[in-house]
């Protein structure tokens, strides 16, 4: 078989991969075989963690809401009852917005909870 000299095409492909992994440590940014492996691993991790980030933030919002509601003796609510009553009253407040209200303006959250209790 004759030898195929790839010339600039292979070099172009490798330099493109090198630019992607240039910030990696050690051989992961220098050796061609490990560069391709680390690029694939990085892209897989990025894809996986985009979904994981959504899960983590939802859990964070839930724990923030629950901590603020349970911490106040004025309101006898727990998280699940609050969310259930929000849905039954058809209030369009998602967990992210309720968590921001809980952190920034606790009084508003307690006003919302008290109005839900009264009705």
From Swiss-Prot:
One of its GO terms (biological process) is ribosomal large subunit assembly. GO terms for molecular function: rRNA binding; structural constituent of ribosome. It is found in: Plastid, Chloroplast. It comes from the Eukaryota. Its main location: plastid. The keyword Cell cycle does not apply. Keywords: Chloroplast, Plastid, Ribonucleoprotein, Ribosomal protein, RNA-binding, rRNA-binding. CDD domains: Ribosomal_L20. Pfam families: Ribosomal_L20. GO terms for cellular component: chloroplast; ribonucleoprotein complex; ribosome. Binds directly to 23S ribosomal RNA and is necessary for the in vitro assembly process of the 50S ribosomal subunit. It is not involved in the protein synthesizing functions of that subunit. Belongs to the bacterial ribosomal protein bL20 family. This is Large ribosomal subunit protein bL20c. It comes from Phaseolus vulgaris.
